[in-house]
């Protein structure tokens, strides 16, 4: 979401990497969010391209992010720091220069071809069963779809 703001509304320039050893692309904002939002990252990842392609995609992801932050609160009995820092900035403001004329578009499926399906939820479930089983854990029991 921060990357969407930076790429839609920012001015691209060159800056130094964190170590100072290399030059990196940066996007500076002049709308008061420069010091609040995270730096742009993974700008060509299909999910990043998807979220900044249309306002409806951005709004959908904001709603998902808020839901995930709420789930974090239920599980760990505290508010995630990212929500404290970015909640109002991200979900109270869509990027100014984002396309507004198209409805929610098809979700990108960033996974091996053998897991891709017509439906993104089915595809990601297949991906997690096949490739992410070793690290998947749950606090409220294993979901039925995972077996």
Question: Locations of the language-model features?
Answer:
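Sequence termini and other peripheral, non-core segments
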Residues: 1-44, 48-147
């Amino acid at each position: 979401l921060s990357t969407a703001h930076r790429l839609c509304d920012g001015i691209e320039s060159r800056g130094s990497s964190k170590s100072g050893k290399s030059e990196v692309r940066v996007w500076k904002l002049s709308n008061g969010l420069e010091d609040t939002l995270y730096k742009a990252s993974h700008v060509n990842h299909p999910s990043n391209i998807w979220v900044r392609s249309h306002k409806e995609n951005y709004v959908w992801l904001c709603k998902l992010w808020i839901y995930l932050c709420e789930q974090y609160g239920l599980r760990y009995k505290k508010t995630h720091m990212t929500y404290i820092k970015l909640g109002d900035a991200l979900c109270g403001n869509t990027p100014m220069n984002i396309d507004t004329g198209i409805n929610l578009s098809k979700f990108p499926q960033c996974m091996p071809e053998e897991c891709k399906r017509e439906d993104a939820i089915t595809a990601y479930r297949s991906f997690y069963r096949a490739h992410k089983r070793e690290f998947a854990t749950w606090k409220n029991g294993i979901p039925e779809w995972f077996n």
